[in-house]
Amino acid sequence: MARRRDELEDTFMYAVKEIYYTLQGEGAQTGRAAVFCRFAGCNLWSGREQDRATAICQFCDTDFADTNGPGGGKFASAEELADAIAAKWRDPAFPSPEIGTRDTHNAGPSTPAARAASAQEPGSFREFVVCTGGEPLLQLDADLIAALHDRGFEIAIETNGTIEALPGVDWICVSPKAGAQLKQRSGDELKLVYPQAGADPAAFEDLPFRHFLLQPMDGPQREENTALALKYCLEHPRWRLSLQTHKLIGIP
């Protein structure tokens, strides 16, 4: 089983599947430009198809095994990884030729100090990184949080909630999984893949989150699951429907 960064030996390297620039495709931040840093490894599934049937999470639709994706690799320090993430924002070759490439002439200040200062200006925006996986909290640590903040980034995580987030994370999205103990019980959004046997949305409604979202489970029953999620949101208006828009428009 994967271990947390602070439980590993001094020779630990951040293992990252891929780093890329795109739009957030789901949840409360849908449509927002972001650098995605997908960490390798998860504590609810190995990422190998031969293990799926015995995994706690059997419906994962993400390839997070190994470090062989675009921009991926092993990074020896938080500074090195933060630089790799910042480079994707400064010079983002948008990965979908059908959509086009982003104009980098208006990409914003080019140095960490200038970017951090500009984020404080009225009407400005902060560069945005989404730490995802796999399970990002197996590796995201205080050093990396500090290094990303030094470069002006707002930090979001997409977590299964089985590990408590460290201080300094700016946006916490928890996606609970049936059969896994929920330890991160507060945050900005709770995004529940629906339907899940053993994960009733009503069981999470008293938790202190700002946004509650139902996301239809992908796969062969996607249309049926979408109809069920739509019906639930109409009957329980606290919940909002989250669609995977990146899949609909063909971007990562």
Region annotations inferred by a language model:
Residues 3, 9-10, 14, 21, ...:
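Conserved Radical SAM active-site core
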Residues 20, 26, 242-246:
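Generic secondary-structure boundary/loop-capping signal
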Residues 27, 38-49:
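Short, intrinsically disordered, charge-biased short linear motifs at domain edges
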Residues 34-39, 54-57:
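Residues immediately within or flanking Cys/His clusters that coordinate Zn2+
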